[in-house]
Amino acid sequence: MVQVACGIDIGGSGVKGALVDLETGEYIGDQIRIPTPNPATPEAVATVCREVIDQLDVKIGVPIGVTFPAPVFNGVIPYMANLDQSWVNVDVDALMERYLGRAVVALNDADAAGIAEVAYGAAKGRDGVIVFTTQGTGIGSAIIVNGTLLTNTELGHLEIDGTDAEKNASSGQKTLQGLNWEQWAQRLQRYYSHVEFLLNPDLFVVGGGVSENHEKFMPLLKLKTPMIPAKLLNTAGIVGAAYYAAQNS
């Protein structure tokens, strides 16, 4: 059984990577971070990913997972918000294999964080339907059913009251609109009640920086489904990418 995998998390400002102990979900050694190139074209970002695995000295045969701030359908990105638009319709599996010299497993960054929370974090040992949401500028999401990830769910783009849910209920909008915790909680109530109605989940896990202040908003929500804060936070993307790559290589 594979004991070690590599996770690479591509973000708008930085490309981060680390080797992960698959038994514990912890980093082996230090994380590498290289600023995201500008412009963040596919070739430029792939070159940085190569630098990351070279600095980590990732051996041939070690699974590599790479996260993107976009959906990834069968290795192809249909649209891109946070990197260069030249990523649209790129076969990222083929691109990364060309630059890294080996196959990778590509996935959405929220999917990676969600599967990490189920494998090693707040939802470890929990069965049933787990809905993970990450709060930030928008709302990322992952749905895991009895340990199996349903990819590219994009629950932040559910239409609620005539607009994308994340345009009302993200923590980014809380900051932008100067909402207090009670005002924001009213919007969260509308959003999570809708998700609860659609999916009837067994557990909500909420990530993103705002989850560190969970005691200020979670008690204000009235949901049938239990809600808990994420545990892994800054390591979740890399850990989830590594775990998912090991499961799917």
Model-derived segments and their meaning:
Residues M1-P63, V72-Y79, V92-V104, A116-V131, ...:
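ATP-binding/phosphotransfer module of carbohydrate and carboxylate kinases, centering on a glycine-rich
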Residues F68:
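Glycine-rich nucleotide/cofactor/substrate-binding loop typically near the N-terminus or early
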Residues P78-V88:
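Conserved phosphate-binding/catalytic loop of the ribokinase/pfkB sugar-kinase fold
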Residues A106-A110, G114:
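Short loop/edge segments at beta-strand edges and connector loops
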Residues I139:
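Basic- and aromatic-lined ligand-binding clefts that recognize polyanionic substrates
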